[in-house]
Design a protein with these regions (language model features):
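Interhelical loop/hinge segments that connect adjacent transmembrane helices in multipass membrane
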Residues: 1, 141-145, 165, 169-176, ...
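Signature of the first transmembrane helix
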Residues: 3-57, 211-238, 366, 385
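Interfacial transmembrane-helix starts/ends
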Residues: 5, 72-86, 207, 275-301, ...
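Interfacial segments at transmembrane-helix termini and the short loops linking adjacent helices
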Residues: 36, 101-117, 300-329
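Transmembrane helix-bundle signature of multi-pass secondary active exporters and lipid flippases
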Residues: 45-53, 243-262, 294, 324-331
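Helix-loop junctions and terminal segments of transmembrane helices
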Residues: 55-72, 135-136, 246, 250-277, ...
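Membrane-interface junctions at transmembrane-helix termini in multi-pass inner-membrane proteins
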Residues: 65-69, 123-146, 326-353
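Hydrophobic alpha-helical transmembrane segments
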Residues: 111-118, 144-193, 356, 360, ...
Length: 434
């Protein structure tokens, strides 16, 4: 995987830059809004994100499954943005309609706040489909720039609003929605995706194929975000504000792991199915090592800085991060498993693990939130994520013939990893007093 080093480094830089700006933005929001205000903003964004994640019809999974047929690649590319805008518009309209229906129930945000958030859904859908194609085309530098400029635009808007005294729940939501337009503009202008007349027949076939996977995709999203809806309904915006900040900080642990998964995605589609299984196992072993290092670093860093940065009102966030990080890292390290199962075009083995984990998550949240609030929510999430990965590992082993122990790094691999980390630290003079 030596040829992956330049794109890995660039994507890592892009994700790190995005992360820094995201943290800066979250500090600005936390200092301007109390936990209740952050909870209201995040619920509006969560509704829009739900429209994206439940309404995308799993087209990006269908794109991945069809990419191995080289004759379809050009049309899949040209279809990505128009299809995303069309599907996204339908999803946004449906989300606003449901928002109207549930006004006054379950602490649902104001309808105009929901309309503002959902205005970003069509562009967000175009970004979702377009980014997947960009990565499949091995143009990781474009995906990185799109990610970086989007975060920069959102962060700049929040800083300007803060300086001018215009920062409010509505302007925070508006900045979030507008950031998708920046990302989509970069993807198209920089050649990540091609804008030309779409192939309507293939677009229809892609949607139909995606629907075969969509129950699993919907369950996977609800696995990640149903906890926010349940926490909002059972505990209220204050707990949502603290919990969602913890989720944002816990996801720092995904940085290196997600980047490595993105830049190695094309490797899983280069060879025969048998070779792909071996490559997948090698990728996962390295991602486990990255994940453990990232988890420890994240928990220690958050414990040290959360109160000075965000204020005493968010002090409980550090405890929630410690409960969330193991599940978040495990979920990220398992991404190559999903890609392998998608390549095998076995919709059942993609759908069933997500549905099972969702049932576990909802059941545990319903039981634990009334007793333990946000802490119970974090515990339920980590247990559910673990159950998802366990099922995916079982299906991978059955499909490929590779045992689950082969997905764990060996002692020699761990030694090489730690030696390399120490060498890099010495080069940076880390840990020296002078």
């Amino acid at each position: 995987m030596a040829d992956r080093k330049p794109p890995f480094v660039w994507m890592l830089v892009a994700r790190a830059g995005t992360l820094v700006m995201g943290i800066l933005a979250s500090v600005v929001v936390a200092r301007a809004l109390p936990p209740e205000g952050r909870g209201t903003y995040y619920m509006a964004v969560t509704v829009a994100t739900a429209a994206l994640s439940l309404g995308h019809l799993s087209v990006e999974q269908a794109q991945t499954a069809l990419w191995s047929e080289k004759g379809h690649r050009s049309s899949l590319d040209s279809n990505s943005v128009p299809l995303g805008l069309g599907v996204g518009t339908a999803a946004a309209v449906a989300a606003v309609g449901l928002g109207l229906l549930f006004q006054g129930h379950g602490n649902m945000p104001d309808i105009w706040l929901l309309v503002t958030a959902c205005a970003g859904v069509p562009m967000g859908m175009g970004v979702l489909y377009g980014t997947n194609i960009t990565l499949l085309r091995d143009r990781t530098h474009v995906a990185g720039w799109a990610m970086l400029t989007s975060a920069a635009a959102q962060c700049l808007c929040l800083i300007v609003f803060g300086v001018t005294g215009l920062l409010s729940v509505w302007t925070v939501v508006a900045a979030w929605a507008a950031s998708y337009a920046v990302s989509l503009g970069v993807l198209t202008a920089a050649g990540g995706v091609t804008v030309r007349r779409p192939d309507l027949r293939l677009a229809r076939a892609t949607c139909l194929k995606g629907l075969r996977f969509h129950a699993g995709s919907a369950a996977a999203y609800l696995l990640l975000r149903s906890d926010v809806f349940l926490l909002n309904a059972l505990a209220g915006p204050h707990d949502v504000g603290i919990y969602t900040l913890a989720v944002t900080l816990a996801e720092m642990s995904r940085l290196a792991v997600d980047v490595f998964a993105q830049v190695t995605l094309s490797l899983q589609f280069d060879d025969t199915a048998g070779d792909s299984a071996v490559v997948t196992a090698r990728i996962i072993r390295f991602m486990v090592l990255l994940g453990v290092a990232s988890a420890v670093t994240t928990v220690v860093a958050v414990s040290a800085v959360v109160t000075p940065l965000y204020g005493q009102a968010y002090a409980d966030t550090a405890t929630l991060v410690a409960w969330l990080v193991p599940g978040v890292v495990l979920l990220s390290a398992g991404r190559p498993l999903s890609s392998f199962l998608l390549r095998a075009r076995m919709s059942r083995v993609v759908v069933l693990p997500s549905l099972t984990a969702l049932v576990v998550n909802v059941g545990l949240n319903a039981a634990l939130i009334p007793a333990w609030g946000a802490v119970g929510c974090a515990i339920a999430s980590t247990v559910a994520y673990t159950s998802l990965i366990a099922l995916q590992v079982a299906y991978f082993s059955r499909t490929s013939g590779i045992g689950w122990r082969c997905l764990l790094p060996t002692g020699a691999e761990a030694t090489r990893f730690t030696t390399e980390v120490k060498r890099r630290c010495r080069q940076l003079h880390l840990g020296r007093a002078a």
